[in-house]
Amino acid sequence: MSNSHTLFEAAQAHIPGGVNSPVRAFKGVGGDPVFFESAKGAYLTDADGKQYIDYVASWGPAILGHTHPDVIKAVQTQAEKGLSFGAPTEIETTMADMVCDLIPSMDMVRMVSSGTEATMTAIRLARGYTGRDKIVKFEGCYHGHSDSLLVKAGSGALTLGVPSSPGVPACLAQETLTLTHNDSEEVKKVFSEIGDQIACIIVEPVAGNMNCIPPEDGFLETLREVCDESGAVLIFDEVMCGFRVGLTGAQGRYNITPDLTTFGKVIGGGMPVGAFGGKKEVMQHIAPLGPVYQAGTLSGNPIAMTAGLKTLELISKPGFFEELEAKTTKLVNGLQKAADEAGIAFTTNQVGAMFGFFFSEEKDIRRFSQVAKGNMEQFKAFYHGMLDEGIYLAPSAFEAGFVSSAHTDQDIDDTIAAAKKVMATL
């Protein structure tokens, strides 16, 4: 019996399901979750002392790998000065300046403590700014677990949304329209009929919660156009893809300017953090400048700001993202070749240092319905095979993978070799 199994059994006594976030429970792949004790660079070490090459990266933040010495040193220095003050600090301003310098669409930014808090508040701000209630989201995109966003589509594009979780009031869900991701025509149709009632569109410009799904040509442009025509606010949820697919995020990569953007993950350097920001015209409606309320005890926490600032400084160095993307391409191509040699129906997607793979006959996967049709049994078998080989992937067929600057060419080669071995058994 493994130490992870023993720890999981003990955890379930007082933690619901034994985990503090559902995907960690391994329900998507079966078996016990792995409990980790330490991490360094591209490697995780579990409670039994086994090492794994890590492609989960704490679900995205660890773009530099784990325990980067410069980040650790900066955090230790700040910790000696104080963990939290509940008052303004200079580093909050320094961090805000850097984010706004890197992201041209951001005139102002507000720091919060999680991605969910960022998206929740961005939607509240859009509603307050426009005086409208309805919002548009897309099937397969995840924007945290606030009530307005735990909604699935009704029977048609204009049908009232229905809650996707108990505890979400139907009256709130009715204000959320869930449309087909990457379907420009459906977006145009909805806006032609009720565009003057819609406060905002929120979208992951690179969807990372139905694996890794890039935008189809013209999709993001359509969102910008209908928002301009209707007066709705365009929100890019870059909590996952921001500072991951490039230094200027997905909006820089695809040259689309949103009105508001949400960030998280990478900008905290491994600490809990979120942020939302955008055009001054919109942001000046947030308290204390305006009437739209938002507050947080740990917003702008100096430890999180320190870790995030150091991370942004390091990833801003010339050539960082080019090297990271090249590593990711090598990995993705190697996985595809391993599957092809084994005669396995397999497809990969990549945007920058984000990647995804699908056990599927389809070769151009751009929508949630395509992801859901994948061979989940093959995915589970592949997942556990790779785990046995010391490769830690996301324990869900609906989550993206991440490469860090700590991954070496040898790490990539070892991962591809493991994939060849496992693919041959499927």
UniProtKB/Swiss-Prot annotation:
Key words of the record: Cytoplasm, Isomerase, Porphyrin biosynthesis, Pyridoxal phosphate
| Subunit-structure text | Homodimer.
**PANTHER family the UniProt entry points to:** GLUTAMATE-1-SEMIALDEHYDE 2,1-AMINOMUTASE, GLUTAMATE-1-SEMIALDEHYDE 2,1-AMINOMUTASE 1, CHLOROPLASTIC-RELATED
Question: What GO MF terms are annotated?
Answer: glutamate-1-semialdehyde 2,1-aminomutase activity; pyridoxal phosphate binding; transaminase activity
Which cofactors is this protein said to need? pyridoxal 5'-phosphate
**Source organism:** Hydrogenovibrio crunogenus (strain DSM 25203 / XCL-2)
Alphabetical list of Pfam families matching this protein: Aminotran_3
Q: Pathway of this protein?
A: Porphyrin-containing compound metabolism; protoporphyrin-IX biosynthesis; 5-aminolevulinate from L-glutamyl-tRNA(Glu): step 2/2
Q: Which SUPFAM superfamilies match?
A: PLP-dependent transferases
UniProt-listed PROSITE patterns: AA_TRANSFER_CLASS_3 (PS00600)
The family note in this entry says: Belongs to the class-III pyridoxal-phosphate-dependent aminotransferase family. HemL subfamily.
The answer, when asked if Signal is one of the entry's keywords, is no
Show the catalytic activity: (S)-4-amino-5-oxopentanoate = 5-aminolevulinate
Quote the gene name from the UniProt entry: hemL
Q: What is its EC number?
A: 5.4.3.8
Q: Name one GO cellular component term.
A: cytoplasm
Origin superkingdom: Bacteria
Residues carrying N6-(pyridoxal phosphate)lysine: 265
Enumerate the subcellular locations listed in this protein's record, separating them with semicolons: Cytoplasm
Please give a single GO biological process term from the UniProt record. Answer: protoporphyrinogen IX biosynthetic process
Protein name (record): Glutamate-1-semialdehyde 2,1-aminomutase
